[in-house]
Amino acid sequence: MDSSQHHPWVGNWKLESETGFVDWLIAQGATTAEATAERDIIRRHTTLTIAVDDDRVDLIWSTNIRGRLRRTKTVLSYSLDGVSVTTTDTPLGSVSATAAVEQDMLVHRVIGPRGTETHRRHIVGGRLHQTMTTDDPALSTTTCELIWRRTR
């Protein structure tokens, strides 16, 4: 079976709208200016590709700002068993993450210096809804939602 039929969130996505993302980034330690700039770059210049191969999922973030020398591509690859840990270095420090398919959702659990984050992605009305919740003991629980539209 084609993985895009089996997992409806497989494909290329552009950010369409968000609720609480800037506040979520600020809670992660970004300044208001940094958080706003990051949201704008993601909205205008970034494509998220989700690919599944066997029992692995790849999240590929491609950013291309025309007229500037800013092209980045970040690939995060996870086992979909919900147990195997992938460790990644971030500006906030080292984080460990797992991935799993729960019902119709792609779920990542990320443990880092600021506590645990849960990222859930699922399809609603043809759009990819991504909900991110941070449970930081020093902060109240923070949640945001990103809505992505399919490209190509």
Where do the language-model regions lie?
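Hydrophobic small-molecule pocket/channel-lining residues, especially in calycin-type beta-barrels
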Residues: 1-152
